């Protein structure tokens, strides 16, 4: 079993992210635009889906 503090830390780096709908880039949770040029720095972001 994984420790709760480690689980929270891992979740911060792996789960609490935003995803670009056009190029699927993994972005910080508070991002407003994508950082990638190939999708034109679009603002179409979604939160990363949570584990069940």
From Swiss-Prot:
GO cellular component, one term: ribonucleoprotein complex
Predominant cellular place of this UniProt entry's protein: cytoplasm
Residue numbers binding Zn(2+): 20, 23, 34, 39
Any single biological process term in GO: translation
Database matches in InterPro entries: Ribosomal_eL40_dom, Ribosomal_eL40_sf, Ribosomal_zn-bd
Protein family (similarity comment): Belongs to the eukaryotic ribosomal protein eL40 family.
Complex formation: Component of the large ribosomal subunit. Mature ribosomes consist of a small (40S) and a large (60S) subunit. The 40S subunit contains about 32 different proteins and 1 molecule of RNA (18S). The 60S subunit contains 45 different proteins and 3 molecules of RNA (25S, 5.8S and 5S).
Role description: Component of the ribosome, a large ribonucleoprotein complex responsible for the synthesis of proteins in the cell. The small ribosomal subunit (SSU) binds messenger RNAs (mRNAs) and translates the encoded message by selecting cognate aminoacyl-transfer RNA (tRNA) molecules. The large subunit (LSU) contains the ribosomal catalytic site termed the peptidyl transferase center (PTC), which catalyzes the formation of peptide bonds, thereby polymerizing the amino acids delivered by tRNAs into a polypeptide chain.
Stated name of the protein: Large ribosomal subunit protein eL40
Organism of origin: Candida albicans (strain SC5314 / ATCC MYA-2876) (Yeast)
Taxonomic lineage from the root: Eukaryota, Fungi, Dikarya, Ascomycota, Saccharomycotina
Name of the encoding gene: RPL40B
